[in-house]
Regions:
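Acyl-donor (CoA/ACP) binding surface of acyl/acetyltransferases
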Residues: 1-33, 50, 67-166
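Short amphipathic alpha-helix in the helical subdomain of ABC transporter nucleotide-binding domains
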Residues: 41-45
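A short helix-loop-beta-strand connector motif used in the catalytic cores of GNAT acetyltransferases and
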Residues: 53-65
Length: 166
């Protein structure tokens, strides 16, 4: 999978991405709204990459790398994860990339790819209520708030996107 947006190159995770990915995953600001907020160590970062590599093979989707088109630096991820609640949509960016509209740019491109190329119809997203930037992105993409859910003792807003608007 090689997808491009105006400022991003979007592709599959590879084991060679470990050092760049670890720099993102060890930042407490980036991890603040993810599960318990714990940063990942290098071993956990590699496990995350391997989980996505396995997901590409098994489901034909996963979380994808986001690279800056100019520098080719790995700056985040965006994509899909098969979960008990359905196909989950998620994204995150390196803190130095916040505030430039890259979250929406990536999410818009990857969501369109998921619908048009992979054929996904119903997609869920869980977001902590205080993560206003992510809520704004989801709502701008057309995700609709469904309910609040408790996961690992934290409250999340559950959003749903359906490509079948009937």
């Amino acid at each position: 999978m090689n997808l491009k947006s105006d400022r991003l190159l979007i592709g599959h995770f590879k084991r060679a991405d470990l050092q760049e990915w670890f720099l993102i995953e060890r930042d407490p600001s980036v991890r603040k709204y993810i599960l318990d907020g714990s940063v990942l160590n290098e071993e956990q970062s590699l496990a995350y990459i391997e989980q996505n590599i396995a997901s590409y093979a098994k489901f034909n989707f996963g979380r994808y790398t986001l690279r800056d088109k100019k520098s080719l630096r790995l700056i985040g991820m965006c994509g899909f994860l098969n979960t008990d609640m359905g196909i989950d949509f998620g994204y995150r960016l390196s803190k130095d990339m916040w505030g430039y509209g890259l979250g929406f740019e990536a999410a818009n491109a990857v969501l369109a790819y998921g619908i048009k190329v992979i054929g996904l119809n119903h997609i869920v997203a869980g977001v902590m209520p205080e993560n206003l930037a992510s809520i704004k992105i989801l709502e701008r993409l057309g995700f609709i708030y469904q309910t609040d859910v408790i996961y690992e003792r934290k409250t999340y807003h559950k959003y749903m996107f359906s490509s079948n608007k009937n």
